[in-house]
């Protein structure tokens, strides 16, 4: 009997030991991520997703696309999310955040520095910089061209001023972003191959970064105003988030597009007499040559607006 009892005790001891190891391993695996998530929270976040999940799913079926959404009402901390932690190619949305990094790392006077570039530096879709090869442009004008006109050469110059794609990634890491991967310059970063994590992020992470730059403490007030004014003047987003909000709402946004039907828009939106709303909507399709749908972004925005009223 004593032997059986000892065997039984041994089995119990082994089970407890394995359970202890499992819990320890789980903590080791998730602890870092949980700590990062905790650092991102600035207040109690209230989620409102039950009513919107079905609507976003229906939009995916309607447009034959995958959609990632994250929105936060900065006045109430209510959030809307859908596939908010899934990766999407960020495409040209990075230009607004890279402009924020540029402002973070440089004085406002630096924006008056004249940057010269050659015809060989030009890449596809550079409607502003291609007109100034002979004269160069002020750094502030280049940042504005990247944000407002989505000028790709301007985007590359922004990258160069902050240490390249990896310099951009490093700056975001310092802000608590352990998600965004930035690897390539324009225009290769728009390749957007499904499953390729290069030049990708999530709707939640992008919205969190945009919030930090536009209403948070990542920039002082004077620099925040410069960035948001650039975004308010965006010339490429009229059919996107702007099309999904009431006409009396003010929108500052940055769009993006790429292969595989990639269409994105990120924005800070000011409803009348309310705190701003931060919105990130990312989308993609399965086929490389698939056309993107601006209307998908507009209708996803309508779902967000209705849910946050």
Swiss-Prot record:
Keywords of the record, alphabetical order, are: Antibiotic resistance, Hydrolase, Signal
Which GO terms fall under molecular function for this chain's record?
beta-lactamase activity
> What Gene3D superfamilies does the annotation carry?
DD-peptidase/beta-lactamase superfamily (3.40.710.10)
Q: What is its EC number?
A: 3.5.2.6
Q: Any signal peptide, and if so, which residues?
A: 1-28
One GO biological-process annotation of the entry reads: beta-lactam antibiotic catabolic process
What reaction does this enzyme carry out catalytically? a beta-lactam + H2O = a substituted beta-amino acid
Catalytic residue list: 92 (acyl-ester intermediate), 188 (proton acceptor)
**KW Signal (keyword) present:** yes
Q: Which PROSITE patterns match?
A: BETA_LACTAMASE_A (PS00146)
Q: Main EC class of this protein?
A: hydrolase
The protein's matches in InterPro entries, at most eight in alphabetical order, are given as:
Beta-lactam/transpept-like, Beta-lactam_cat, Beta-lactam_class-A, Beta-lactam_class-A_AS
Which residues does substrate bind? 254-256
Keyword Hydrolase recorded = yes
Q: Which family does it belong to?
A: Belongs to the class-A beta-lactamase family.
Tell me more from the record.
The class A beta-lactamase family has a specific amino-acid numbering system, sometimes called Ambler or ABL numbering and often misspelt as Amber. A multiple sequence alignment was used to derive a consensus sequence and then the consensus was numbered taking into account insertions and deletions. This allows use of identical numbers, e.g. for active site residues, despite differences in protein length. UniProt always uses natural numbering of residues, hence there appear to be differences in numbering between this entry and some papers.
Q: What does this protein do?
A: This protein is a beta-lactamase with a substrate specificity for penicillins.
Query: Which protein are we looking at?
Result: Beta-lactamase
Q: Name the gene that codes for it.
A: bla
